[in-house]
C-alpha cells in the first residue's frame, strides 16, 4: 500500500500530490519518519519555507483520540502510538491527526461531493474498510474514537480467520482489497481449475 500526500493552499487548492510506499515492517516504525522526510523534500523542491506552512493533517486508518493518539492500527502494525507528538517532532510543524475516513468526509463536506451539506456519510474502501459520519458539520467520533468504523463490524460469526484487529468475521475481511485477495486465494486453494487469478499469482 501507499501513503498519499498532498500540498494545498489554505483555500484547498492542490499545489501538488504524490505518494510514497508504506513500510509496515518492524511495527511500522518507518511510516512517520518517511512522511516527514517526504514533506521536507517537497517543501525544498517547491522552495517553501517550513515557517510558511500552517500545519500538517494526517489521516490514520484507526480510531484516534483528541490528543492524536492511537491504541491499535492493524494495517500499519502500530500499537499505542502518539502520532501527533511524533509527527510534530519529526517535521518541526504543527500537526492535527484524525481517523482517515473522518478527515476524508470533512474534506468532501468542505470542497467535494458533500459541499454545502451538514450531514454526510462516507465509506472508504482500500487496504481496509472505513466510514466517516458527519452530523451538524462535526465528525461523529464516538467515545473511543471509533465512531463510523464500519470495517470492524462483525458480519460473519462463523469466520475462523482473524482480522488484523484481532477479531473474526469483520466486514474488512470480505470487502477490502486485502479481504477480497484473501477470499480469492481461499477459493483458488480449493481446486486447480483454470483461472486468470491463478495465472497472475494473486
Regions found by a protein language model. Name each.
Residues 50-51, 191:
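A short alpha-helix-loop-beta-strand transition element characteristic
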Residues 1:
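Asp-based phosphoryl-transfer active-site loop
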Residues 6-12, 16-19, 25-30, 90, ...:
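Glycine/GP-enriched mid-protein hinge/lid loop-to-helix segment characteristic of carbohydrate kinases
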